[in-house]
Amino acid sequence: MLCGLAALDITPKLGENIPGYFEARRASGVREPLAVRALACSNASGACFALVNLDTIDCDPRLSARARARFERLTGVPGAQMMVSTTHTHTGGPVD
């Protein structure tokens, strides 16, 4: 089995909108960096899958569909083999 890991910092910039509250909130500091993390694995027969997790409140289905389509286009692995999830944090930035 082959596996690969990746992470990308998605910590909101100071002053950026923080969704998930009834009133408007802006990022005023960083306690812990936020990230999008990915794990991709394949076995000896070539079967592959990928797990992607975002430190965000949610992920719009249109965004995950675009990510799956890009994954499929770049790797040749069906987009259905990619799972997208979130940590549902109320301290992350907006997801576009």
Language-model features: locations:
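Conserved beta-alpha junction segments in alpha/beta enzyme cores
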Residues: 1-96
